[in-house]
Amino acid sequence: MISVIVPVYNVEEYLEECLESIKQQTFTDIEVILVNDGSTDGSREICERFCQKDSRFKLINQENQGQSVARNRGVKESVGKFIMFVDSDDVINKNLLEVLLPYMKTEVDIVECRMTRKKEEFYLNKPSKIVFKGNAKEAILNCIEIKEVKFCPVTKLYRREIVEKVPFLEGYIYEDVFTGINYLKHMRKIVVVDYIGYYYRVRPNSTMTKSFTEKDLDIFKVGNQLIDSFKDDEDMLPYIGYFMFYIGHGHYLKDGINKMNIYADLYEDFIRKAAFIAKQSKEVVRKYRLLRLYLFAPKYYTTITYPIYKRLQNRWISTKKLINNLNDKLHIRKIWLFKYEG
């Protein structure tokens, strides 16, 4: 059995579409654990309606305690051999579980599909194929280099034991940074398939789109706990240091931080600490250009070095696109001339 866990909070506008996509799964041996996290809109009533019509749906009501608490509660109440998390404003392909389950072979603990923010892409039915397969270290390196493996908790089918080893950090946002990497740390193997099975809806008030608040500073608490969880792994710790350096700088940019901001020192201290951990490995320094740029001039990285690097990078990308377009046009012209002369 597969347990599908859905934390629910004030999503009445999207919830029915989400639950219907789970209900319509072609793999039917499922239970759907809905954890209503103190919704004040019509979400609870929608959940109750699905539970009345389909015995596979089970509703748990709790006071508002946050998404992590809701997910942990869902895991505790579930009984499936495998677990999948679905956010209540998203949609999954009706074939998703049927596609992922066959890849859950011996020693494979996680199977991941692709997600999209474009609905037209979501509805394309393409055959699945493996695009990555690896052990814990290989998967973590792939993830921190922003390749096939993602650290988000959704889009994945998990073997139950992995999820039980790593509860979600409660009381934080960005908790998936810690949980996602630690899932990879504790697993044996992961398989990633080139199958778009998950539609991720970006809402105006989501964590990724809202304006900066003090709650965004949770990324440092989560990041420090992630670093601490690898303190006994001398081989991987510098890579985690680089990952948090990258994440920390990404949040510096996303949150609109500058030298005049009251939190600037907090961001820069975290970036500095993460870079120090990363530079303990010559291999990590050699491998990651952004880290080398930072170590070259730490004081000027956010204000001078990185902005110049990005401008040059964007200019190179634009030039490369222009060259590719010209090559395409020349190729088409050659074909046309060949046909004409023939």
Residue ranges and their predicted role:
Residues 67-68, 88-191, 201, 205-214:
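Donor-binding/catalytic cores of nucleotide-activated saccharide
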Residues 21, 28, 36-45, 65:
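A conserved acidic beta->alpha catalytic loop
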Residues 1-3, 21, 31, 178:
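Cell-envelope/extracellular polymer assembly enzymes that use nucleotide-activated donors
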Residues 10-24:
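Short, well-formed alpha-helical segments that are part of the catalytic scaffolds
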Residues 62-78:
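Glycine-rich, basic loop-to-helix element that forms the pyrophosphate-binding segment
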Residues 29-38, 58-63, 88:
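Short beta-strand/loop segment that forms part of the nucleotide-sugar
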Residues 259-342:
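Membrane-interface aromatic/basic loop that binds lipid-linked glycans or pyrophosphate carriers
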Residues 83:
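Short aromatic/hydrophobic "clamp" motif used to bind/position activated sugar donors
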